[in-house]
Amino acid sequence: MGTDIGDLLQKRKIELSDLSNRVVAVDAFNTLHQFLSIIRQRDGSPLVNSRGKVTSHLSGLLYRTASLVEAGIKPVFIFDGKPPDLKSETLSRRKEVRETSLEKWENAKAEGDLEAAYKYAQASSRVDQEIVEDSKYLLGIMGIPWIQAPCEGEAQAAHMVLKKDADYVASQDYDSFLFGAPKVVRNMAVTGKRKLPGKNVYVDVELEVIELEETLRALEINRDQLIDIAICVGTDYNKGLEKVGPKTALKLIKKHGDIHAVLREKDMEIEGLDRIRKLFTHPEVTEDYEIKWTKPDSEKLIKFLCEENDFSTDRVEKAAERLKAASGARQKTLDQWF
């Protein structure tokens, strides 16, 4: 997902407390995908209610968001709109991967291979419209704002940070920098120990921040050149050049100046290059949004999560209390200004 330029970026470890009282524009689809991939049972089966409806995303949204606001963080979730036409090939490939993974998951379960089953189950995750609508509803009754982007959610989130309506973008993908995001937080949705896919190895997943200007200075390039590097490697809108990884792409762009010169040197072309560039430099965004946190509605949370989706009443009530306490602390901070 996104572009593979992570090895070039300057990453810095931070704590949740470092984001206290900061507005974080969260890439909603990216975050929901993480919840759907990770919150699963041993055989890879997602959490479901008594009717068989998937609820892993609701669990992740409720409990992780409660932890974030409890830490003083002010999240606003940004949902993707209609994808650009140039993304259709990538979306088709992802669909094929999901369908293949789903078949392999069923086979692995039948064979009793739980490790393989879990791996393939993660790759079969899909954020559908019902999941999106349920997530928006849950955020609303939690008192957490969400915004519908006209196109790419990461582009909208980056725009909001550039406008100073938010302080950070939160996403696992690196596309945010191509859209101009000054600061991006990674691993905000899930931290702690994670098992590497296909390996009996666990790694610590820690919160980290990447700053665009710091990276550009270290690489001695500008943002347009970073976009060109990403296009060389491959983005959601193009496959990239054969056998060109991020480090090779960096050398090529620094040597030749831009991607047009690289393509001339290699006697190659990338179809729709200028359109691809424009999707990053002039993305479709909206100014029609409001960021407002409100008190959670405990009654609606109980009805939606416990009565309709079989969540533990005790756990939901505790999460609601955490959200209420954070909302009260936020209001107290605001009152100090007036």
Curated annotation (Swiss-Prot):
Residues 116-257 are annotated as: I-domain. Binds 2 magnesium ions per subunit. They probably participate in the reaction catalyzed by the enzyme. May bind an additional third magnesium ion after substrate binding. Keywords: DNA damage, DNA repair, DNA replication, Endonuclease, Exonuclease, Hydrolase, Magnesium, Metal-binding, Nuclease. InterPro entries: 5-3_exonuclease_C_sf, Flap_endonuc, Flap_endonuc_arc, HhH2, PIN-like_dom_sf, XPG-I_dom, XPG/Rad2, XPG_CS. Its EC number is 3.1.-.-. It comes from the Archaea. Residues 330-338 are annotated as: Interaction with PCNA. Its cofactor is Mg(2+). Pfam families: XPG_I, XPG_N. The keyword tRNA processing does not apply. Residues 1-98 are annotated as: N-domain. One of its GO terms (biological process) is DNA repair. Interacts with PCNA. PCNA stimulates the nuclease activity without altering cleavage specificity. Structure-specific nuclease with 5'-flap endonuclease and 5'-3' exonuclease activities involved in DNA replication and repair. During DNA replication, cleaves the 5'-overhanging flap structure that is generated by displacement synthesis when DNA polymerase encounters the 5'-end of a downstream Okazaki fragment. Binds the unpaired 3'-DNA end and kinks the DNA to facilitate 5' cleavage specificity. Cleaves one nucleotide into the double-stranded DNA from the junction in flap DNA, leaving a nick for ligation. Also involved in the base excision repair (BER) pathway. NCBIfam families: fen_arch (TIGR03674). This is Flap endonuclease 1.
